[in-house]
Amino acid sequence: MSFDIAKYPTLALVDSPQELRLLPKESLPKLCDELRRYLLDSVSRSSGHFASGLGTVELTVALHYVYNTPFDQLIWDVGHQAYPHKILTGRRDKIGTIRQKGGLHPFPWRGESEYDVLSVGHSSTSISAGIGIAVAAEKEGKNRRTVCVIGDGAITAGMAFEAMNHAGDIRPDMLVVLNDNEMSISENVGALNNHLAQLLSGKLYSSLREGGKKVFSGVPPIKELLKRTEEHIKGMVVPGTLFEELGFNYIGPVDGHDVLGLITTLKNMRDLKGPQFLHIMTKKGRGYEPAEKDPITFHAVPKFDPSSGCLPKSSGGLPSYSKIFGDWLCETAAKDSKLMAITPAMREGSGMVEFSRKFPDRYFDVAIAEQHAVTFAAGLAIGGYKPIVAIYSTFLQRAYDQVLHDVAIQKLPVLFAIDRAGIVGADGQTHQGAFDLSYLRCIPEMVIMTPSDENECRQMLYTGYHYNDGPSAVRYPRGNAVGVELTPLEKLPIGKGIVKRRGEKLAILNFGTLMPEAAKVAESLNATLVDMRFVKPLDEALILEMAASHEALITIEENAIMGGAGSGVNEVLMAHRKPVPVLNIGLPDFFIPQGTQEEMRAELGLDAAGMEAKIKAWLA
């Protein structure tokens, strides 16, 4: 989409923070209105994360207006809310390409812009990185400032509190901005807090506060009285006690949609020493009523008509694998009162909405706390229940020690339903499910299953749920199932694959949902096709049978080749001294960028044509 200067006359003057800082303050509310409309126009045409960015327009403008970015370093947590930041930092005309192959990255990305200080995608990393950056800036000695912006969801994670605890100890000069869009702010309380925030962040108050502490530092009763008086003044209107106890100077909450008020407060706080904490209240989806009413639905959107206020309805085609999981979960819970389901803030994405409504006493959303989710499941298992952890592949990485130490070593029957395994598409490097087979395969006592279709997925979930000798995992992809018939549930024999097609010379050992493409290749090359089903334990007898009756083996998986299922096949053959040529097909040794799943599979040679070409080139 070409930029319409007539439609956005103020935004047309701003293609960088330097140009932003040339504008008079009085024009900034108009700039915010235009920026919000441009974001709506752009994302509705291209798709992308939507509601979060609408809520951070004023904050983004205020931060770049007050701070000398990129010299001063601005760090965004997660990055869903950073679209306005991208628009104001030289990427305005490319915002329509965001999340597309070869387009702007969906999150702040160091390789894309000098204004993107930290590459992000996973939550709760900003404060830890910000402390390191602030310490480095202090040693540099050039008065470079550090600001971290974190949301009310991300700040609930343990890593954020670990970082704040450390900041309170070493006291770097930095600002943490909490973008809180969970609660509404009433006009009266908001006005009082805005006034108080500007007072408490001002130089006079700060000087009196620090000077008073120095004067009375040797008089404990008076020092304690001053501290309590300050706390009572703040406590009348602010909920910042926790952050003060962690060692931060807390200001807020303030109206995050008052751009001029934010600028005043940020200017006052800019030169304060030590860790500062600014709590702002915003509304997710601000300025677009449908998104304000339903920010979860409008969190990430496909292309849509903004005048309709509705997102396009699903075509009613095949169910997603997440839906297959959710249906199985409800079906099983209705029969077994011991079932408990856990998710780290992924209710909608993991297909658990219906379960949460039907079985609220057995549904646990632990927020963005993957480590806690896994060890909580371990505790439930110890207590005699049957926990299921529904989690994205990329987020399970954050709880690796808990899987190993708290579940596997104790042989606890926890079932991991691993969604978004393999290539996920538009969210790029930080969200691809490329590594779960590699990092789980080396854990003793773990059973790992890779369904080739939705019926296999149900059978494997059932098998894992009834496996009581240790943990199990079923990994399945983002996207729709393939349309096979669903058969009655029954336990699969652990560690056994099945031959789907008999051929000659070549045997293709497939792990997972690339099976339809693998079947095309097998047909074209007249190869034997095996659905291996289990990555751990591997069907060693079947592998050795295939090695004995074929000239070469091909392994196929949508996981990193290094350490993946194919590596396991290689290990079996070497352990039995079978010098059979093996070609491992899977994800290469680099972080997979954004693009649709179809685009990336084609580029990586994981569609039928690409696999066949790789095999023919290898055999030549």
Swiss-Prot record:
Mg(2+) binds at residues 152, 181. GO terms for cellular component: cytosol. It comes from the Bacteria. Thiamine diphosphate binds at residues 80, 121-123, 153-154, 181, 288, 370. Binds 1 Mg(2+) ion per subunit. It catalyses: D-glyceraldehyde 3-phosphate + pyruvate + H(+) = 1-deoxy-D-xylulose 5-phosphate + CO2. One of its GO terms (molecular function) is 1-deoxy-D-xylulose-5-phosphate synthase activity. CDD domains: TPP_DXS, TPP_PYR_DXS_TK_like. One of its GO terms (biological process) is isopentenyl diphosphate biosynthetic process, methylerythritol 4-phosphate pathway. Its cofactor is Mg(2+); thiamine diphosphate. Pathway: Metabolic intermediate biosynthesis; 1-deoxy-D-xylulose 5-phosphate biosynthesis; 1-deoxy-D-xylulose 5-phosphate from D-glyceraldehyde 3-phosphate and pyruvate: step 1/1. Gene3D superfamilies: 3.40.50.920, 3.40.50.970. Keywords: Isoprene biosynthesis, Magnesium, Metal-binding, Thiamine biosynthesis, Thiamine pyrophosphate, Transferase. PANTHER family: 1-D-DEOXYXYLULOSE 5-PHOSPHATE SYNTHASE-RELATED (PTHR43322), 1-DEOXY-D-XYLULOSE-5-PHOSPHATE SYNTHASE, CHLOROPLASTIC (PTHR43322:SF5). Catalyzes the acyloin condensation reaction between C atoms 2 and 3 of pyruvate and glyceraldehyde 3-phosphate to yield 1-deoxy-D-xylulose-5-phosphate (DXP). Belongs to the transketolase family. DXPS subfamily. Homodimer. This is 1-deoxy-D-xylulose-5-phosphate synthase.
